[in-house]
């Protein structure tokens, strides 16, 4: 089974249409990976589906980087 980090990065690549080499743990979804507000909503939905969890809107707004998403998933699954 892939690690949480690998799974999150795979989803980021798929949702944002970026290469795996562009996705670092410190990458900002908006500033570094070019996500807009719709992209971030779709990204959160994909993470919720993959990890079978719900990410409340107020928490989703705090997920600014790849590492933020990884940390949230690890803490809540």
From Swiss-Prot:
The keyword tRNA processing does not apply. PROSITE patterns: CARRIER, PHOSPHOPANTETHEINE. It comes from the Bacteria. The modification O-(pantetheine 4'-phosphoryl)serine is found at residue 37. Residues 2-77 form the Carrier domain. Its main location: cytoplasm. GO terms for biological process: lipid A biosynthetic process. One of its GO terms (molecular function) is acyl binding. It is found in: Cytoplasm. InterPro entries: ACP (IPR003231), ACP-like_sf (IPR036736), PP-bd_ACP (IPR009081), Ppantetheine_attach_site (IPR006162). Keywords: Cytoplasm, Fatty acid biosynthesis, Fatty acid metabolism, Lipid biosynthesis, Lipid metabolism, Phosphopantetheine, Phosphoprotein. PANTHER family: ACYL CARRIER PROTEIN (PTHR20863), CARRIER DOMAIN-CONTAINING PROTEIN (PTHR20863:SF76). Carrier of the growing fatty acid chain in fatty acid biosynthesis. Belongs to the acyl carrier protein (ACP) family. This is Acyl carrier protein. It comes from Marinobacter nauticus (strain ATCC 700491 / DSM 11845 / VT8) (Marinobacter aquaeolei).
């Amino acid at each position: 089974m892939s690690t949480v980090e690998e799974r999150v990065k795979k989803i980021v690549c798929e949702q944002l249409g970026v290469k795996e080499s562009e996705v670092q743990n410190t990458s900002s979804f908006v500033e570094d990976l070019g996500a807009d507000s719709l992209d971030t909503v779709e990204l959160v939905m994909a993470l919720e589906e993959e990890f079978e969890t719900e990410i409340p809107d107020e928490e989703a707004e705090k997920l600014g980087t790849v590492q933020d998403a990884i940390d949230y998933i690890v803490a809540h699954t």
